[in-house]
Amino acid sequence: MAITENLIFTEPYFEAEMNHHTEGLEPVINTLRSDVSLKQEVQHMLVKFTSNTETLLHGDLHSGSVMCTDNETKIIDPEFGFYGPMGFDIGMLISNFLMAYFSQPGHRTENTLEQYQNWLLSII
């Protein structure tokens, strides 16, 4: 759980070894990192996250952890499992799809952009 705490509730809000971002995002990153009220709210969320053990979680659920065929779906890589708040895993998975959605203009041509973004939204 400590890795998850750091990656979600702590390290995004200051310069940390694991943080990497596109240079063009520097103004947005600086704004978020200097927002004291945002940091306070995140700390309230951290307290809720660490004190709520209502279900067993995967702990690192993202699109790379979901293996699908036409007939079945398997979830892999459970090594970060822990007890936590019920909505955490699905929230992480949805956020992974949303990050992919918003990053697509930097990765796709106009011809394929809208179709792929629509597909991502249809998954959610």
Task: Describe each region flagged by the PLM.
Residues 1-58, 69:
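ATP-dependent phospho-/nucleotidyl transfer catalytic cores
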Residues 50, 54, 86, 116:
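Aromatic-acidic/polar surface patches that form glycan- and anion
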Residues 60, 65, 77:
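Conserved catalytic-loop position in the HRD/HxD motif
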Residues 73, 81-83:
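Activation segment
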Residues 1-11, 72, 87-91, 120-124:
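Internal hydrophobic scaffold segments of catalytic domains
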Residues 56, 74-77:
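Pre-DFG segment of protein kinase catalytic domains
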Residues 87-124:
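Active-site activation/catalytic loop segments of kinase-like enzymes and analogous catalytic loops
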Residues 66, 83-85:
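Conserved protein kinase catalytic core
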